[in-house]
Amino acid sequence: MRWDLRRSFQRIEWHGPWPPALPEARPLIVCANHHHFYDGHLLWYLLTDTLGRPSMVWMQEWNRFPLFAPVGALPFPPDDPQTRATTVRRTARQFQAHPDAALFYFPSGTLQSPNVGIGPYAVERFARLHRLYPDALFWPVALHVTWDGAPHPVAQFQAGPCLDLERQAPGAIETHLRRQWRRLRETTAAPTHLLMRGRTSPADRWSFAWTLPLFKRLLPP
């Protein structure tokens, strides 16, 4: 997946304080918008490859793409409640075995156009996850893909604080996620941390300065 990201993006950026303030011994449910094909890859790169936390994602089409199992994909077919229940239990066991593990969760349920924006999400979804995994903290992570003056897409991350639903309302997850996503879309600030340098642009690879004497002679007087 690292190779796939490197060939698909000009760079992957983090906006905001780095490294993020995450608890070492609490499971995370990473709540992210799902606007781009590579969102799952990007979250894996951030949480597992960069921050070193084991990760999982519930995947509706796992039967079609079981090759993602080694990187934490678990089957979650919409028409098979028994398999979904097994995945829920397997996730709980992973959280117990690895207290720093992260579950990627897309509240929209499906891939959506960025034009749709963030939400509204049914807060009962977050409340249900909290009942299943009461020790887990919810971490709203916004993803945005832009060209940003580059010849290839640039992926950007920005995150809110970790939320404990024992103390905060489930609706706070959507509020923080929307706020961070809007900041990413409107930001003109440089990233605080470069997570990956991917495809180089032609301007970075090529220089024709050696032809300067020739073309100078072709300029009009």
Ranges and model annotations:
Residues M1-H34:
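Helix-to-loop junction immediately C-terminal to a conserved catalytic motif
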Residues M1-R11, N63-G72, R199-P221:
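Alpha-helical membrane-targeting segments
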Residues F9-H15, D80-A92:
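Glycine-rich, highly charged phosphate/nucleotide-binding loops
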Residues A21-L22, F65-L67, W147-P151:
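Short glycine/serine/proline-enriched coil/turn segments at secondary-structure junctions
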Residues E24-Q82:
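Catalytic core of membrane glycerolipid acyltransferases/transacylases, capturing the structured
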